[in-house]
Amino acid sequence: MMLEYVLGLSAYLFSIGIYGLITSRNMVRALMCLELILNAVNINFVTFSDFFDSRQLKGNIFSIFVISIAAAEAAIGPAIVSSIYRNRKSIRINQLNLLNK
Protein backbone atom coordinates (compact mmCIF):
# COMPACT_ATOMS: atom_id res chain seq x y z
CA MET A 1 0.00 0.00 0.00
CA MET A 2 2.84 2.38 0.75
CA LEU A 3 4.38 1.64 -2.64
CA GLU A 4 1.45 3.20 -4.50
CA TYR A 5 1.66 6.43 -2.53
CA VAL A 6 5.38 6.83 -3.06
CA LEU A 7 5.12 6.05 -6.76
CA GLY A 8 2.22 8.49 -7.05
CA LEU A 9 4.34 11.19 -5.41
CA SER A 10 7.21 10.39 -7.75
CA ALA A 11 4.96 10.49 -10.82
CA TYR A 12 3.48 13.79 -9.64
CA LEU A 13 6.95 15.35 -9.18
CA PHE A 14 8.10 13.99 -12.53
CA SER A 15 5.01 15.37 -14.28
CA ILE A 16 5.47 18.81 -12.73
CA GLY A 17 9.12 18.76 -13.79
CA ILE A 18 8.36 17.75 -17.38
CA TYR A 19 5.57 20.30 -17.68
CA GLY A 20 7.81 23.05 -16.30
CA LEU A 21 10.69 22.04 -18.54
CA ILE A 22 8.49 22.10 -21.65
CA THR A 23 6.71 25.38 -20.89
CA SER A 24 9.57 27.26 -19.24
CA ARG A 25 11.08 30.23 -21.01
CA ASN A 26 13.47 31.08 -18.19
CA MET A 27 16.71 29.11 -17.82
CA VAL A 28 16.67 29.21 -14.02
CA ARG A 29 13.15 27.77 -13.96
CA ALA A 30 14.23 25.08 -16.42
CA LEU A 31 17.10 24.11 -14.12
CA MET A 32 14.70 23.91 -11.17
CA CYS A 33 12.37 21.67 -13.16
CA LEU A 34 15.30 19.46 -14.10
CA GLU A 35 16.07 19.10 -10.38
CA LEU A 36 12.46 18.03 -9.79
CA ILE A 37 12.81 15.35 -12.44
CA LEU A 38 16.03 14.06 -10.92
CA ASN A 39 14.47 13.96 -7.45
CA ALA A 40 11.50 11.97 -8.78
CA VAL A 41 13.90 9.48 -10.33
CA ASN A 42 15.77 9.20 -7.03
CA ILE A 43 12.54 8.47 -5.19
CA ASN A 44 11.84 5.67 -7.67
CA PHE A 45 15.32 4.19 -7.27
CA VAL A 46 15.10 4.12 -3.49
CA THR A 47 11.53 2.82 -3.47
CA PHE A 48 12.14 -0.03 -5.89
CA SER A 49 15.42 -0.91 -4.20
CA ASP A 50 13.63 -1.19 -0.86
CA PHE A 51 10.58 -2.98 -2.24
CA PHE A 52 12.21 -5.64 -4.41
CA ASP A 53 15.58 -6.31 -2.78
CA SER A 54 16.05 -4.66 0.58
CA ARG A 55 19.35 -6.43 1.36
CA GLN A 56 21.21 -5.10 -1.66
CA LEU A 57 21.61 -1.36 -1.87
CA LYS A 58 22.00 -0.92 -5.62
CA GLY A 59 19.15 1.55 -5.93
CA ASN A 60 20.34 3.56 -2.95
CA ILE A 61 23.90 3.71 -4.27
CA PHE A 62 22.69 4.77 -7.70
CA SER A 63 20.49 7.46 -6.16
CA ILE A 64 23.53 8.82 -4.30
CA PHE A 65 25.32 8.93 -7.66
CA VAL A 66 22.40 10.83 -9.21
CA ILE A 67 22.35 13.24 -6.24
CA SER A 68 26.05 13.98 -6.79
CA ILE A 69 25.43 14.64 -10.49
CA ALA A 70 22.51 16.92 -9.55
CA ALA A 71 24.75 18.79 -7.11
CA ALA A 72 27.30 19.36 -9.85
CA GLU A 73 24.52 20.55 -12.14
CA ALA A 74 23.25 22.87 -9.42
CA ALA A 75 26.73 24.36 -9.08
CA ILE A 76 27.62 24.65 -12.76
CA GLY A 77 24.17 25.55 -14.15
CA PRO A 78 23.79 28.95 -12.44
CA ALA A 79 27.38 29.81 -13.38
CA ILE A 80 26.59 29.16 -17.04
CA VAL A 81 23.34 31.13 -16.74
CA SER A 82 25.14 34.11 -15.18
CA SER A 83 27.80 34.14 -17.90
CA ILE A 84 25.10 34.00 -20.59
CA TYR A 85 23.26 36.84 -18.84
CA ARG A 86 26.47 38.87 -18.72
CA ASN A 87 27.00 38.43 -22.46
CA ARG A 88 23.42 38.49 -23.78
CA LYS A 89 21.58 40.55 -21.08
CA SER A 90 18.79 37.96 -21.07
CA ILE A 91 18.18 34.50 -19.65
CA ARG A 92 15.06 33.77 -21.67
CA ILE A 93 15.51 30.59 -23.65
CA ASN A 94 13.64 31.73 -26.75
CA GLN A 95 15.78 34.89 -27.09
CA LEU A 96 19.08 33.04 -27.02
CA ASN A 97 20.79 31.90 -30.15
CA LEU A 98 24.32 31.01 -29.15
CA LEU A 99 25.41 30.34 -32.73
CA ASN A 100 25.06 34.01 -33.73
CA LYS A 101 27.22 36.71 -32.23
UniProtKB/Swiss-Prot annotation:
Gene3D superfamilies: 1.10.287.3510. It is a multi-pass membrane protein. One of its GO terms (biological process) is photosynthesis, light reaction. InterPro entries: NADH_UbQ_OxRdtase_chain4L/K (IPR001133), NUOK/Mnh_C1-like (IPR039428). Signal peptide: none annotated. Pfam families: Oxidored_q2 (PF00420). The chain crosses the membrane at residues 2-22, 32-52, 61-81. HAMAP family: NDH1_NuoK (MF_01456). NDH is composed of at least 16 different subunits, 5 of which are encoded in the nucleus. NDH shuttles electrons from NAD(P)H:plastoquinone, via FMN and iron-sulfur (Fe-S) centers, to quinones in the photosynthetic chain and possibly in a chloroplast respiratory chain. The immediate electron acceptor for the enzyme in this species is believed to be plastoquinone. Couples the redox reaction to proton translocation, and thus conserves the redox energy in a proton gradient. Belongs to the complex I subunit 4L family. This is NAD(P)H-quinone oxidoreductase subunit 4L, chloroplastic. The gene is ndhE.
